[in-house]
Amino acid sequence: MIKIMADSTCDLSDEVLKMYDISLAPLTINIEGKVYKDRVDIHPDEFYGMMEALPEFPTTGMPSPAEYQKIMNEAIEDGHKEIICICMSSGTSGAYQSAVLARDYFFEEYPNSNVKVHIVDSKSMSHGSGWLILKSALMRERGASFEEIVAFNEKYKTKVKHFLSVDDLDHLLKSGRLTNASAIIGKILMLKPIMSMKDGKGAIVGKERGLKRVLQHYTQEFIKRNDPKMTEFIILGYTSDHKVAENLKAKIQLDTDFKGDIHIMQMGVSVGTHVGLGAISMFFMEK
């Protein structure tokens, strides 16, 4: 059996992780000087409940090579001979490089090992890498080989389309995604920036006034960009407001001819630190 692993920014639900035996290397979150492991020491609902009251913005840190090594070693001890690790974009974090170092350390220690390890730089964030991970798990369950799953990821990883909008511009300002002037103008005009990924980095691709316009934007972009042969499922993400994601799901079902699964999953602490409360996202395969 092929082992699939990732980092905690993939934001897949606990149910999915358990169902497909996917292991995560946790990022760290520094909250008022105390360091937590994402999804180990702190969980999304707990974090979002305290977020507004925090006097300063939390910071995040990438998983260490040791975290990846631990998962790889456990997988090998369990009898896995093939390991695929799908990481958040190297353009936004050092997580990919940490995983590469962990793999290199393993083969330095065991140069004659017949274990296969492939590290994927997903060029994605949040449920974008999560989309690839879930697709890889489904391929594995259907009998795809290690080589076939690796080839799919490397060929199609840049086709995972991201859309993410935020409710609080201060988080994008703090993370360097907005200038101070843009944030001020956005607040005055009640504009919600819409972000996507370009060359493995986050970029603002649009602005809409009000949530209703945002959901309309998402639906129209899906109709225009979706590859019906490749989009087996859609993932919708949210930080604190599940109802908004449900509304977007209903709109997609009403306004488009998509008949596949639409998964709703909460964004985790690491991603939520940068996008804040009220964020909503959509992920699918584009043409």
Name each region found by the language model.
Residues N112:
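Flexible loop/hinge segments that line or gate small-molecule binding clefts
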Residues A53-D104, F146, V150:
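Glycine-rich phosphate- or other oxyanion-binding loops that anchor nucleotides, phosphorylated ligands
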Residues I84-C87, V117-D121:
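Short acidic, glycine/Ser/Thr-rich loop/turn "cap" segments at secondary-structure junctions
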Residues K3, T9-L17, I22-S23, T28, ...:
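Mixed-charge interfacial surface used for oligomerization/domain docking
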Residues K3-P63, E67:
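N-terminal glycine-rich anion-binding loop in soluble enzyme alpha/beta folds
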